[in-house]
Structures are given as structure tokens and as C-alpha cells.
């Protein structure tokens, strides 16, 4: 069997889209599963839209997710260069061979002339090119040249139906009349994507083309071009195709770059970790088993086969992504989670980098099983680094927990904590349990709700006693007294 060679070949425009990254993941996983190679090349021939910033973003995305490649940009390989903008001479050479072999021909017809011929024949004028220039005589060509016309170059499409066995969709067929001769080079001689993409695949000996469903209609043209490239000695084989299902967004519409959920880096900013993102993207068209949604990247690679990918559209579900991410956060060793959380808070929030390491380790331990994203870690811990006078109580939580009935547990809690000699979690818990649960006979939810809101500003926080230890005696008592003074709580007008 020929060694598998797959490619990921994005254009450097905008920010990485989750659908694009899903394509990269499936190519990477297939290469790793089969022991093949992933080639990462850049299709940067659109000078008006391409940017070095977007190129850097693609590298960042691949590196963040751990999707390494065997040949391509930045790492090199036997088929350098791996950016289309640097391969113009190669494309011109192949185009010349196609012209010399009669595989492509000059077409001088304007769009208006094509439409007029359709009208004259009683056909829909928007049918597209009619292959008229295939049979131009030398005299006709000379006349067009004398007019100053510059031809585009079109590939002669064989007049046949097109069938192939798609790795995802099974047998696919396009009728011959749907595939007119297509342009491979502009009138200025510049080769188009329709030529350079298959040429790169041919020269880089790509065996499997795994790409989005939106490119399915172009497959007959590409197969025809591969056959022409084989006849002129440029290609050795026609690759096998597999077209991955659309990723759908809200309202069952295809997820577009305008949808916030499509932005990979926004998910990173929101605290999705690579393991969670890879797991979730893997489920967009594939599954490990009917009853297992959580898997490691190693399990994914070991079990992934492109033949198991489903053809039906996959819907992007933010809540499911976050639930899967939560599982992967919990699976991290405590020390690694602490490092990830610290790095996230440092890059994306105002959490102070000089917060004591021992206290941060304790705090990280408290939130690891309570968050779905790293960003939620900030939400749970920010009260620890907020000045007492700057703490703002969540209005809904304060209205619910700082009613008239909260005065008694607040007073008792303050008195009990003032008497604690050594400020530790066990001592704090013992003092509050004795004062509020045993002596006042309150249920824990009633007893501690007001205290939690008072010290954290929120109804949800890390465990109360541990939070008080982290906050310290002075800040804890200052906040409790401030909340007591504001009880019963009245929302600001």
C-alpha cells in the first residue's frame, strides 16, 4: 500500500475558523493513524486578501492544538517552497506543458458573447461557458488576436459522466453537461487556484484529499485535471477524495466566519483548553462510540478512520463544547491545571501575576472541579484580589441572601470569627458550625448563604471556609461587617 500523504492548505485570510481547524484535525489524525505524513502548505495567491498576520494566526492555531506537520511551511521538506506565492515558476512550467500537449486551449469569448449564443439557441443565458472556443480555426484565432483580445486558458473536459467513490459519501456522480471546460489561467497568463491546487497535490504526491463539503462540486474538474497532469508526466496518481460534512451554526445555517462561535481564538480567550477543543471538533462528524463522548487525543488517533466520518451536517453546540472542556479540565493533573490556569489568567485577565504561589495553588485546587472553562476560574477567584472597598455585590444574589433574616447569621458569624485564634480552614469551619448550625439551629444553606455573598459578592464561590482562609482574617471580617451594615439589602436606585 502507498504511504498516506494528506495535506492542509488554508489561505491566510482572517482568523482561524473552527470548520477549517476541524479539517486540519481530521487530516492530522488520519496521517497519524495510518503512519503517513501531513503536509502543511499555504495558498497565498490572493494578494488583496492574504496577510502575514493571518499566516501567523494559522501557525499559532496549529501549534496551540498540537497539530504538528511533517513537511511544509516553517519545517521544510523535499517539495519546497510550501507557499503558493513562491511557486509561480513551477505553475508556469506546468501550464506550458499543458498548452503544448493540447490539454488546455485559448478561449477568447466574452461573457456577453456566451450569453448571446445561449439566447440564440433558446437556452438559459446563465448556463455558463458553452465550450465554443474548443474548435476555433487558426483564422478565427488570428482575427481575435488582431482585435487585441487576450485569451484565458481552459482545460478540455472529457464528455463523460463523473463518478468516484468518496471516502465519506460513497459513490458520487456528476453528469457531463454540468461540467463545462473551465479556466485554469487568466488572460495575463497567471494560473488560477483551479490549476495550482491540483498541481501542488500532484507534485507533493498527495494520496488523500480530505476537505470540506463545499468543494465537492469542483471534484470532477480536479479529477479531469489530474488525468491531464498524468498524461504530461506531472502527476503519478489521482488522489482519493473525502468530503467532510458542513459545520452548522444557529438556526441550522452553515457556520460562517461572522458567527462568534466560529472564531477559534475566541474560544481560547474564553478558556477552552486544547484537549477540550480537539475532543469536541473530533465529534463534528465522527464518534468513538455511541456511549463515549470523552476521549484523549491519543484515543482519537488510535481509532480514527476517515471511512467512519458521517456525511450529515454537524451542528456546533457551545454548551456541549464547554461540558466536554470541563471533563478535560478535571482530567488534568493538579499541577498542570494550576499552570494552565495561571497562564490563562496572566494572558487574558487582570489577575495579579504576583499573587502568592502557595495561595494560588490552594485556590486552583478549589476550582478545578467547579469550572467548565479557564475563564470561569477567573470569575470564581477574582474576589480574592479585589480590594475590600471595591467589592461589588451581585444584585440578584444580595437581594436573595441579604434579607432581614440574614442579620442573625451575619452577627453570629462575625462574633465567632473574631474569636478564631489561628486562621485556618478547620478552625473557621468549627467556629461557624458551632455558632450557626449548633447554637442557632440554622440549615447550612441558610446559615452560609449570606456569608458567601458577603465575602465573594456572588451566590457561587469556591468552598466558603477555604475561601475565608485564602481571603485572610482582616478582609473576611471587613466584608462581613460591610454586608451586615447593608442588610437588609436595598438595590441602588
Swiss-Prot record:
HAMAP family: Glu_tRNA_synth_type1. It is found in: Cytoplasm. ATP binds at residue 257. One of its GO terms (biological process) is glutamyl-tRNA aminoacylation. This is Glutamate--tRNA ligase. It comes from the Bacteria. A motif ('KMSKS' region) lies at residues 254-258. It holds the Pfam family Anticodon_2. One of its GO terms (cellular component) is cytosol. Keywords: Aminoacyl-tRNA synthetase, ATP-binding, Cytoplasm, Ligase, Nucleotide-binding, Protein biosynthesis. Its EC number is 6.1.1.17. CDD domains: GluRS_core. Catalyzes the attachment of glutamate to tRNA(Glu) in a two-step reaction: glutamate is first activated by ATP to form Glu-AMP and then transferred to the acceptor end of tRNA(Glu). GO terms for molecular function: ATP binding; glutamate-tRNA ligase activity; tRNA binding; zinc ion binding. It comes from Corynebacterium efficiens (strain DSM 44549 / YS-314 / AJ 12310 / JCM 11189 / NBRC 100395). Belongs to the class-I aminoacyl-tRNA synthetase family. Glutamate--tRNA ligase type 1 subfamily. A motif ('HIGH' region) lies at residues 10-20. It is an enzyme of class 6 (ligase). It catalyses: tRNA(Glu) + L-glutamate + ATP = L-glutamyl-tRNA(Glu) + AMP + diphosphate. InterPro entries: aa-tRNA-synth_I_cd-bd (IPR045462), aa-tRNA-synth_I_codon-bd_sub2 (IPR020751), aa_tRNA-synth_I_cd-bd_sf (IPR008925), Glu-tRNA-ligase_bac/mito (IPR004527), Glu-tRNA-synth_I_codon-bd_sub1 (IPR020752), Glu/Gln-tRNA-synth (IPR000924), Glu/Gln-tRNA-synth_Ib_cat-dom (IPR020058), GluQ/Sye (IPR049940). Monomer.
Amino acid at each position: 500500500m502507498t504511504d498516506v500523504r494528506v495535506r492542509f492548505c488554508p489561505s491566510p485570510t482572517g482568523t482561524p475558523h473552527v470548520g477549517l481547524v476541524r479539517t486540519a484535525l481530521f487530516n492530522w489524525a488520519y496521517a497519524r493513524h495510518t503512519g503517513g505524513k501531513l503536509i502543511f502548505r499555504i495558498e497565498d495567491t490572493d494578494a488583496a486578501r492574504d496577510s502575514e498576520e493571518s499566516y501567523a494566526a494559522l501557525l499559532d492555531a496549529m501549534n496551540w492544538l498540537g497539530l504538528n506537520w511533517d513537511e511544509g511551511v516553517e519545517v521544510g521538506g523535499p517539495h519546497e517552497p510550501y507557499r503558493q506565492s513562491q511557486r509561480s515558476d513551477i505553475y508556469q512550467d506546468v501550464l506550458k506543458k499543458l498548452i503544448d500537449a493540447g490539454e488546455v486551449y485559448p478561449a477568447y469569448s466574452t461573457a456577453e458573447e456566451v450569453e448571446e449564443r445561449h439566447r440564440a439557441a433558446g437556452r438559459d443565458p446563465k448556463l455558463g461557458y458553452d465550450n465554443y472556443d474548443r474548435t476555433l480555426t487558426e483564422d478565427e484565432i488570428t482575427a481575435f488576436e488582431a482585435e487585441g483580445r487576450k485569451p484565458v486558458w481552459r482545460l478540455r473536459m472529457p464528455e463523460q459522466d463523473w463518478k468516484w467513490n468518496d471516502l465519506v459519501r460513497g459513490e458520487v456522480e456528476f453528469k457531463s453537461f454540468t461540467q463545462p471546460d473551465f479556466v485554469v489561467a487568466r488572460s495575463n497568463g497567471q494560473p488560477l487556484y483551479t490549476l495550482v491546487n491540483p498541481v501542488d497535490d500532484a507534485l507533493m504526491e498527495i494520496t488523500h484529499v480530505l476537505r470540506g463539503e463545499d468543494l465537492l462540486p469542483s471534484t470532477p474538474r480536479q479529477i479531469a485535471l489530474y488525468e491531464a497532469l498524468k498524461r504530461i508526466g506531472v502527476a503519478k496518481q489521482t488522489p482519493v477524495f473525502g468530503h467532510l460534512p458542513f459545520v452548522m451554526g444557529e438556526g441550522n445555517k452553515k457556520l460562517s466566519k461572522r458567527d462568534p462561535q466560529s472564531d477559534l481564538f475566541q474560544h481560547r480567550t474564553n478558556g477552552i483548553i486544547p484537549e477540550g477543543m480537539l475532543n469536541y471538533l473530533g465529534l463534528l462528524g465522527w464518534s468513538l462510540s455511541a456511549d463515549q463522548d470523552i476521549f484523549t487525543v491519543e484515543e482519537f488517533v488510535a481509532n480514527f478512520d476517515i471511512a467512519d466520518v458521517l456525511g450529515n451536517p454537524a451542528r456546533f453546540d457551545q454548551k456541549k463544547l464547554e461540558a466536554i472542556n470541563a471533563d478535560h479540565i478535571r482530567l488534568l493533573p493538579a499541577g498542570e491545571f494550576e499552570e494552565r490556569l495561571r497562564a490563562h489568567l496572566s494572558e487574558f485577565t487582570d489577575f495579579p501575576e504576583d499573587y502568592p504561589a502557595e495561595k494560588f495553588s490552594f485556590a486552583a485546587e478549589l476550582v478545578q472541579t467547579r469550572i467548565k472553562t479557564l475563564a470561569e476560574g477567573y470569575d470564581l477567584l477574582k474576589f480574592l484580589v479585589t480590594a475590600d472597598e471595591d467589592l461589588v455585590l451581585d444584585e440578584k444574589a444580595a437581594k436573595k441572601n441579604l434579607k432581614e433574616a440574614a442579620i442573625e447569621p451575619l452577627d453570629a458569624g462575625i462574633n465567632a470569627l473574631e474569636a478564631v485564634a489561628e486562621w485556618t480552614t478547620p478552625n473557621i469551619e468549627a467556629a461557624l458550625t458551632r455558632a450557626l448550625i449548633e447554637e442557632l439551629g440554622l440549615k447550612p444553606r441558610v446559615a452560609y448563604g449570606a456569608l458567601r455573598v458577603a465575602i465573594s459578592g456572588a451566590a457561587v464561590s469556591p468552598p466558603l471556609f477555604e475561601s475565608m482562609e485564602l481571603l485572610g482574617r482582616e478582609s473576611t471580617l471587613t466584608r462581613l461587617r460591610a454586608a451586615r451594615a447593608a442588610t437588609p439589602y436595598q438595590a441602588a436606585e
